[in-house]
Amino acid sequence: MEQVIFASLAASPTSFRKIRMLLDSLKDFGGELFRAPLVVPHPDSLDVTVENARLLKSPDVHMIPFRISSEEMDFPLSVVAIGAAAAEKAVAGKAENLVWLLEDTLVLKSPSAFVLPASTQYAYRPVHHTKIGSLWKDPPDGFWTAIYRHCKVEPDHLFPMDTCVRDNTIRPYFNAGCQATRPQNGLFSRWCELFRSLYRHPDFKPFFANPLYRVFMHQAVLAGVVLSSFSPA
């Protein structure tokens, strides 16, 4: 079993060159993890050209096609949650840790912090900016109240965290493009399942009049699923 498998989503033809840069950075700066496998989930409808396939040709890279409906593709960033679940399924039983990094990531020093300690089930990076995040100093608004209710989040699982740029202290809201989990926990599968249900749910339709709620719905559901799955302790 691998200690770590990395995963990065190829959502469009332009993804391949960026993922190649991520792969090269892992080789150059990955330290003891420089030979860790990389899985690349992609929609099965994506036309993977010979040129793009050649960019990622490596014994350490494995392409993972997955199904996603045209309706789902039309909803912003739904492909992230669905692709993460495909990666998790592909590495189940093959890795102790799955590190999910979107294509805009580069590794500049050993990513050994992604190797989770025995007592840790999930590691994350906070969101960069507050955007639709829930300010810690204020009660949760209607959107986050609905997220917590549908995801069955216990109130004592909430805690304060700063955004990356430290513009606010918010309730837990994780960057969907930089996270690590244990595949056997099925976290990404639950994320995908709940996202597919909730983005269609009438409770959330009114919020989508503001396009930011559409863009970050996948990330809000991720927060709800993580908080319902694990205790901060």
Indicate residue ranges for each PLM-predicted region.
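A structural signal for well-ordered alpha-helical segments within the folded catalytic domains
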Residues: 17-20, 24, 78-82, 216-220, ...
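Secondary-structure boundary elements
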Residues: 28-32, 89-97, 102-104, 182-189, ...
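Residues that flank catalytic or metal-binding motifs in active/ligand-binding sites
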Residues: 80, 101-103, 174-175, 218
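Catalytic core and acceptor-binding pocket of nucleotide-sugar-dependent glycosyltransferases
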Residues: 154-233
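Short catalytic/ligand-binding loop motif for oxyanion handling, primarily in non-cytosolic enzymes
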Residues: 15, 47-48, 107-110, 115, ...
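GT-A fold catalytic core of metal-dependent nucleotide-sugar glycosyltransferases
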Residues: 81-136
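Charged, glycine/proline-rich intrinsically disordered loops and linkers
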Residues: 135-162
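N-terminal anchoring/stem segment of glycosyltransferases
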Residues: 1-75, 89-94
